[in-house]
Amino acid sequence: MKRTYQPNRRKRSKVHGFRARMSTRNGRKVLARRRRKGRKVLSA
């Protein structure tokens, strides 16, 4: 059985990246939440 995590930089940024977050309203909410919490890294 193969492992579930198969790293792929392009897919990672497409799904969890900053521009992906900014492209939807809920994604912007995620970023706002993380800013409010004081996260050093906002997105992948």
UniProtKB/Swiss-Prot annotation:
Family that this chain belongs to: Belongs to the bacterial ribosomal protein bL34 family.
Native source organism of the sequence: Geobacillus kaustophilus (strain HTA426)
Alphabetized GO MF terms: structural constituent of ribosome
Extent of the signal sequence: none
Ranges where the record places region Disordered: 1-44
Keyword Ribonucleoprotein attributed: yes
HAMAP family, per database record: Ribosomal_bL34 (MF_00391)
GO cellular component, one term: ribosome
Keyword Lipoprotein belongs to the record: no
One record GO biological process: translation
Biased composition (Basic residues): 1-19, 26-44
Keyword list, A-Z: Ribonucleoprotein, Ribosomal protein
Protein name per UniProt: Large ribosomal subunit protein bL34
